[in-house]
Amino acid sequence: MTSGTVKCHFCKKDDSEDKGQPIWVGCEFCDGWCHLTCVPIQFVVPKLENPSQLLAFKEKHVESFKCTLHDESKCALLKLNGVSVGTEDIAFTKRNRLRNKRPIDYIALNEGNDKRLKHEHPHTQAFLACFEKWKDPKAISSSELESDFQIIKVPLRVSDPADSGMYVISANELGLVDSKDHVKLNVEYLTKIMGDDYPLDVMDVQTQMNEKWTLSQWNEYYSHTSPSDRDRIRNVISLEVSHVESFKDGIRRPNAVNNNDLVDIVWNFGRTETDIERPKVTKYILMSVGNAYTDFHLDFAGTSVYYNVISGSKKFILFPPTDYNLKKYREWCDNDNQNDIFLGDQLEAGIAMELTEGNLFMIPCGYIHAVYTPEDSFIVGGNFLTLRDITTQLNVVEIEHQTKVPKKFTFPQFESVMGKTCEWLLNSDHIQSISSEDIENLVKYLSSSNIKYKPINYQSKKELITELKNKIIKFEHT
């Protein structure tokens, strides 16, 4: 509960007077509220022996609540999970079956969020309205994507994905199904490939928080539970699979990505036996059920993204990394009421894109975006840094620092990638391919005492920085 004006239907105290009452429940037919422990036990199913038993129940046990205003005999009804309803309860269900019953998310509510629906994020309607405002389905050919990559600054759908180099192996090619036809990869087949016990983070859409599941649990939820029987809306957006044998060649990125991935370019430059592991961000499988929503965010380090829809559909709203938009984004991240604010209404110059099965989508560096899933979807995508976007990437990393993004959600080994990039630039002819502003920002970044990088071809970080500064002077005199 967050509102200070709502009073308990039974004790009449509002939430500023509730003396630590742990749980509120909301009527599914009006805006009535009450403390769980205030519900008279004669109105509770299953039948309880004394009121103190209500203290043992938590928000997860609440199935539904109807206040006294919706019963001719002024009876309320609180149903708790795992209950077999009796004759009177069945009659209640029949009388009200045509009502617009909207299941309440009691877990989100008692974690400090306002009253909301279990199967719809509170920003969904605002997102859809904003989507119509900015809808602009721009496309580009694969050949143009490759030839013009350095100057592309807007999100674009690739009109001919089959010619882009993008490839995702099929279930029949993996021998998972006996068919000569193309059978798309799905959650069921993914579970067979990676194993029932493979761990993954599953996001609860309402709270935007992750839970630890196994693939078998996710498969049961996604593949074998009907939408009406799913307890909550969930999605998986952080399953990286580049290390999986079946996907090393079984997933291939677009040529434009392979040609411009900064880690690919610099990682093996001057490599030593003691080098740390290459960042694993190149191949993700993303799985969402219908009505899933991911609120506005920046991909770590402002990375560019490729996004291939294997099945289902997606809706994106994206905003460019202008100074104005990034300022609003920082303010929103720092706002204690962040979850109650739809950021899309505050940003400028948006682009909205709807993606369907087979589509390939490219998101440039630094775009602030939110994603809605109209139907169950299975996606293959990945992130990559570029030489083109050095300054914007460094700006986003600074925003991550300012907004205290946990290290787990930042680009892995980013410091090493930037250090290797500097050494690669100084030992090649590629220094001319970036601006003096980019070099100045690299110098500023590496000069921070918080950045720990041990150069491969220089005695110290200080010597590396000195060489970079000398390059800036040469730029200024040419």
UniProtKB/Swiss-Prot annotation:
Enzyme Commission number, as recorded: 1.14.11.27
InterPro entries on file: JHDM1_Histone_Demethylase, JmjC_dom, Znf_FYVE_PHD, Znf_PHD, Znf_RING/FYVE/PHD
Major localization class: nucleus
Key word Transcription regulation present: yes
Positions contributing to substrate binding: T294, K314
Protein name according to UniProt: JmjC domain-containing histone demethylation protein 1
Family (UniProt): Belongs to the JHDM1 histone demethylase family.
Cofactor binding note from Swiss-Prot or TrEMBL: Binds 1 Fe(2+) ion per subunit.
Domain free text: The JmjC domain mediates the demethylation activity.
Keywords in alphabetical order: Chromatin regulator, Dioxygenase, Iron, Metal-binding, Nucleus, Oxidoreductase, Transcription, Transcription regulation, Zinc, Zinc-finger
Alphabetized Gene3D superfamilies for the sequence: Cupin, Zinc/RING finger domain, C3HC4 (zinc finger)
Presence of the UniProt keyword tRNA processing in the record: no
PHD-type Zn finger ranges: 6-70
A molecular function GO annotation: histone H3K36me/H3K36me2 demethylase activity
Catalytic activity: N(6),N(6)-dimethyl-L-lysyl(36)-[histone H3] + 2 2-oxoglutarate + 2 O2 = L-lysyl(36)-[histone H3] + 2 formaldehyde + 2 succinate + 2 CO2
Cofactor(s) listed: Fe(2+)
Localization terms from the record: Nucleus
Residues given in the record as Fe cation binding sites: H297, D299, H369
Function: Histone demethylase that specifically demethylates 'Lys-36' of histone H3, thereby playing a central role in histone code.
One GO CC term, this protein: nucleus
Organism: Kluyveromyces lactis (strain ATCC 8585 / CBS 2359 / DSM 70799 / NBRC 1267 / NRRL Y-1140 / WM37) (Yeast)
JmjC domain segment(s): 242-401
